[in-house]
Swiss-Prot record:
InterPro entries xref list: MRP-L9_N, Ribosomal_bL9, Ribosomal_bL9/RNase_H1_N, Ribosomal_bL9_N, Ribosomal_bL9_N_sf, Ribosomal_bL9m_C
Name this protein carries in UniProt: Large ribosomal subunit protein bL9m
One GO MF term attached to the UniProt entry: structural constituent of ribosome
PANTHER family in UniProt: 50S RIBOSOMAL PROTEIN L9 (PTHR21368)
Keyword match Transferase: no
GO cellular component, one term: mitochondrion
Biological process, per Gene Ontology: translation
Record's subcellular location: Mitochondrion
Similarity comment: family membership: Belongs to the bacterial ribosomal protein bL9 family.
Amino acid sequence: MAASMAPRCSSLLWAGAAWLRQRGIGELLQPRIERSTPGRDFSLSHYQSTVIVERWWKVPLAGEGRKPRLHRRHRVYKLVEDTKHRPKDHLELILTQSVDEIGVRGDLVSVKKSVGRNKLLPQGLAVYASPENRKLFEEEKLLRQEGKLEKIQTKAGEATVKFLRSCRLEVGMKNNVKWELNPEIVARHFFKNLGVVVAPHALRLPEDPITRWGEYWCDVTVNGLDTVRVPMSVVLFRKPKTKRYKHWLAQQAAKITSPEAV
C-alpha cells in the first residue's frame, strides 16, 4: 500500500510544479481584491517615497574575495528616517515678470515647489536659478543701473501703487487764517494720515489754487514711473494742538452762544 502511494504523491508534486511554472507563483500571492472586505481594499498604487533603514546588527567583515555571511539577525532593520515626513524644500527661481506678492523681474525668490512648478514655470513667469541665468540677470541689472535699459518698478513701488489706488486722503485746514494748499502740506498729510512718505516734487495738484474746503485730487508719481490719482478731501481742521488755536476756537464758540449773537 505504501509502495503504491509513493508514485501517486510524486506525480502530484510534479503536476503542481508544472502548474507553478506555467501560471507563475505571483498568481498565488496576488491579492484577491474582489473578495476583500468593502472599504479595506488593497491600494494598487504605491506612495513614491524613500525610507532609510540600517541593520540592527553589523555584518562582520569577510575575507578578501569572499562574500560576508549573513544570518537571521542581519535581516533585522531599524528605521532611520521616513522621507515622507521630511519638511518640504523650497525652490529658488528668478522672476522674468512682476508677480503680485512675490517680486519683480530679476528678483531671486524662494517659493514652494508646488507654486514654482504649477504656476511660475509653466506660465513663463520665472526660470531656474542656474549659474547661467544668474549671470544673465546680473548683467541686465547693471545695464539698468547704467541707464542703457528701461527702468522697472521695484517690489516696494508696486505695493505702494496698489495701496494708493485704494486710498482717499483727508487734509484738515484751519478757518482762522487765509491759506492755500501746496504740495508740502499734502505730503505731510500723506505721512500723517496714510503712513506713506511722498516727496513734494512727486505730487501734482490741480492748476487752480485750492483755498476752500471741498473735494479735489492729487497725482502721486512713484519712483518716476507710475502715477496714481488719489481723491483728496479738504475739510475743517477739528483737532487743535496749539494753545493759540484752542483759544481762538473757544472765542468763536462763545460768540455763537452769546445772547448778542442771537
